[in-house]
Amino acid sequence: MPWSSRGALLRDLVLGVLGTAAFLLDLGTDLWAAVQYALGGRYLWAALVLALLGLASVALQLFSWLWLRADPAGLHGSQPPRRCLALLHLLQLGYLYRCVQELRQGLLVWQQEEPSEFDLAYADFLALDISMLRLFETFLETAPQLTLVLAIMLQSGRAEYYQWVGICTSFLGISWALLDYHRALRTCLPSRPLLGLGSSVIYFLWNLLLLWPRVLAVALFSALFPSYVALHFLGLWLVLLLWVWLQGTDFMPDPSSEWLYQVTVATILYFSWFNVAEGRTRGRAIIHFAFLLSDSILLVATWVTHSSWLPSGIPLQLWLPVGCGCFFLGLALRLVYYHWLHPSCCWKPDPDQVDGARSLLSPEGYQLPQNRRMTHLAQNFFPKAKDEAALPVKG
């Protein structure tokens, strides 16, 4: 195997280890914070932290279990019996099991001098599912936890060391999950245009900078009006859920479980953009961007008209320039990315190759694993991929 290929396999293995470590670190900091809140008599805060952890974990296990049930028979040849897998998911260990399975397969293909096409495709299959689950966990648990911690700090006027650790790990975890998910989507495209270092940095930064003002706006509103933030989230979430439902998603293995995906996507859209339907994304992205921006402006107007100071005595005017600066810088970097670094800007499809023709069959002629869930999403995110995949094979 060429050194470049072995280097790519090693890079994927290291990224898998780092992703799993980041998940465990984030989980540990959340549990640490919950214990500290309980010891300090802040039982409501501790209960909120644990509730967010529990809800996100249950959703993650449901996704994982439904996907495992729908995977082709015999695909996961060395996995435990179905009853053991069901028990693992019931104990909230299904996601960690998948992480271990991915790392084991990644180590296997890296150690082989000439890994088979099946082993390589199976490693990609596992990594793509992990990437999707990590994204769901990020917006179901990490982003709400980050908002909660910021609201607690702003309301109390104190910042404990474990809270700073939680904030740092949350921001990095969210941006990492978005970057890893976007990188995974690119591997599903016909020409497999991987993210370079420059485009990775730009993509990482614009997601971080645009997410920060949104989280800050909701956190400040929560600190000033803790009794109304749940109503605000529920009202906005229902509108976003209706929008997702009207787009007719078909991501899950069967229609009866599609609701889980739709409610999760509606939660993601509360914080960030996520494309769920076929067709050109620019119009939908602009509508969502304007909707979220209008909501954040209304939150800011609510602060200004009701109070100029937080309960902790911190003037709100100190936070507004920070949020605005991050927003405009993130918006500029987003425009740079989509104008010069997006795959559609330098699309170089192979006209002799149809999407899937390369990856569905091995040289020996047997079927290779293909993660149709992520391939479908990649075609939604990058419409040109579907257009090029539909080209007839020449020759």
Curated annotation (Swiss-Prot):
Bilayer-crossing residues are 13-33, 48-68, 159-179, 201-221, 224-244, 259-279, 285-305, 313-333
Keyword terms of this UniProt record: Apoptosis, Cell membrane, Cytoplasm, Membrane, Phosphoprotein, Transmembrane, Transmembrane helix
Q: Name one Pfam family in it.
A: XK-related
Source species, domain of life: Eukaryota
Bridged cysteine pairs (disulfide):
none
Q: Where is this site: Cleavage?
A: 355-356
* Cellular component terms (Gene Ontology): perinuclear region of cytoplasm; plasma membrane
Biological process GO annotation list? apoptotic process involved in development; engulfment of apoptotic cell; neutrophil clearance; phosphatidylserine exposure on apoptotic cell surface; positive regulation of myoblast differentiation
Q: List-wise, which residues carry Phosphoserine?
A: 362
A single Gene Ontology MF term assigned here is:
phospholipid scramblase activity
Q: Which residues carry this modification: Phosphothreonine?
A: 375
Residue numbers on the Extracellular membrane side: 34-47, 180-200, 245-258, 306-312
Activity regulation annotation text: Activated upon caspase cleavage to generate the XK-related protein 8, processed form. Does not act prior the onset of apoptosis.
Kindly give the membrane topology term recorded for this protein: Multi-pass membrane protein
User: What InterPro entries is this protein classified in?
Assistant: XK-rel (IPR018629), XK-related_scramblase (IPR050895)
Spans within the Cytoplasmic topological domain: 1-12, 69-158, 222-223, 280-284, 334-395
Query: What are the subcellular locations of this protein?
Result: Cell membrane; Cytoplasm, Perinuclear region
Q: How is it modified after translation?
A: Undergoes proteolytic processing by caspase-3 (CASP3), leading to its activation.
Keyword Iron, does the record have it?
A: no
Q: How does it assemble?
A: Interacts with BSG and NPTN; which act as chaperones to localize XKR8 at the cell membrane.
Give the protein family: Belongs to the XK family.
Q: What is this protein called?
A: XK-related protein 8
What is the organism of origin for this protein?
Answer: Pan troglodytes
